[in-house]
């Protein structure tokens, strides 16, 4: 199994896009990218806009090769929309290049809030136009040659009862590596993502970490991340909300200590790519101070990502 990070906060954008290739199938997880319309009272800096365009170009390149594309849920950084967006770096036509002719494993509209159900409806109509094979993934399993792909039951996007609803995670096994992809579980804060990972016996875990800036129970999140370490994957990739905080390493320091004792490498998308971390959103105030630029106001609203 080969895998490579595509876009994520350590690479300068909001995303968890990740590419996995086995002997049998090529999967593009959550082919989306977006930028926070406002952070610290500021719109995205031009460097963020440039990075979003670069990530979008890489998504389009990898989508050409992919057999399967996932949509774990309908926040804007996890799918390619059918409408133009500066902050999602798309012209309203790029979704065709991402989804045309693909098998699309997508979250069912159950357990979603109104805005996500609305996006699900729009994306479903767009997928019909592309000839994609759209399948509700929740709890499903698929076999491609010797590669098995399993989707989790619906998992909470953050704490149980969260208004943002639920997501689906995925596990890919090719007989050698076993990779678990847990987007936007925000910790995890609940036990279900851990149970799904435990059943998969992962060698690699990619997990959306806790948003320290939202005041969630960080101690609980670290405890649950420790349970993922105890599964003894060779690599634990921390991603997404956690890396919107410049002090994220200090805030989860006990996890690094445990992982070192257990022989588990704690990685980021940037480190997997052999690149330095560039937390552009977390540095937005600094970027405007060091590289003054006219704010690009697009009129794109403040919705949850």
Curated annotation (Swiss-Prot):
Q: Could you tell me which Pfam families the record lists for this protein?
A: Lactamase_B_3
Matching entries from Gene3D superfamilies are given as:
Ribonuclease Z/Hydroxyacylglutathione hydrolase-like
Q: Which InterPro entries match?
A: RibonucZ/Hydroxyglut_hydro, UPF0173_UPF0282_UlaG_hydrolase, UPF0282_hydrls
Q: Which domain of life is it from?
A: Archaea
Name the family the entry cites. Belongs to the UPF0282 family.
PANTHER family on file? UPF0173 METAL-DEPENDENT HYDROLASE MJ1163-RELATED, UPF0282 PROTEIN MJ1629
Q: What's the name of the protein?
A: UPF0282 protein Pisl_0021
Originating organism? Pyrobaculum islandicum (strain DSM 4184 / JCM 9189 / GEO3)
